[in-house]
Regions:
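Histidine-centered metal-chelating micro-motifs
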Residues: 58-60, 78, 95, 99-108
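A short, N-terminal "cap"/entry segment at the start of jelly-roll beta-barrel domains
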Residues: 2-47, 80, 96, 114, ...
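Extracellular/periplasmic catalytic domains that process cell-envelope and extracellular macromolecules
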Residues: 41-43, 63, 88, 109-114
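Extracytoplasmic
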Residues: 43-48, 67, 84, 100, ...
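A short beta-loop-beta micro-motif enriched in histidine and acidic residues
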Residues: 44, 56-71
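Ligand-binding loop in jelly-roll beta-barrel domains
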Residues: 86, 100-126
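Short acidic-glycine-tyrosine-enriched beta hairpin
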Residues: 53, 83-100
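Glycine- and acidic-residue-biased ligand/ion/polar-headgroup-sensing regions
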Residues: 66-83, 93
Length: 134
């Protein structure tokens, strides 16, 4: 019984996180992998998701209520936060966003191949992972 309830709660949390992160159509497919409270850091949790961008896919401007660590798994992506230049990252490269960064550009660098990233978000428990840029 506990295992079934726990599994259902994890699935629901993953669905909520995916809704939090996913933007408009073409922005990418978010796949929740894990959300876990951090032992020894009261009130904080880590969430891991993959985001797969279709060819030419992009997200609208947004901000995360989290420190976000991005690792490019496949393809290449272009990232830009306010005050910084656009950066093109290839598979095997990483990127960091702080909670105060407005993420202006997050897109697949290719119009012909998909791109996939792993995002690890460290945030307050229960806080939305993503909010629109203001």
């Amino acid at each position: 019984m506990f295992r079934t309830t726990f599994t259902a709660l994890l699935a629901a949390a993953g669905a909520i996180l995916a809704d939090d992160i996913q933007d408009a159509p073409g922005s990418g497919t978010v796949t929740p992998l894990l959300t876990q409270a951090l032992a020894g850091i009261e009130g904080k949790e880590v969430s891991m998701v993959t985001v797969t961008y279709p060819p030419g896919g992009a997200s609208s401007a947004h901000r995360h209520n989290a420190d976000v660590f991005v690792y490019v798994l496949e393809g290449s992506v272009v990232m830009q936060v306010d005050g910084g230049a656009p950066v093109t990252l290839e598979a095997g490269q990483a990127f960091h966003e702080s909670p105060s960064d407005v993420h202006r550009v997050s897109r697949n660098a290719s119009d012909t191949k998909p791109a996939k990233i792993l995002a690890i978000l460290v945030k307050d428990q229960g806080a939305p992972a993503t909010v629109p840029a203001s």
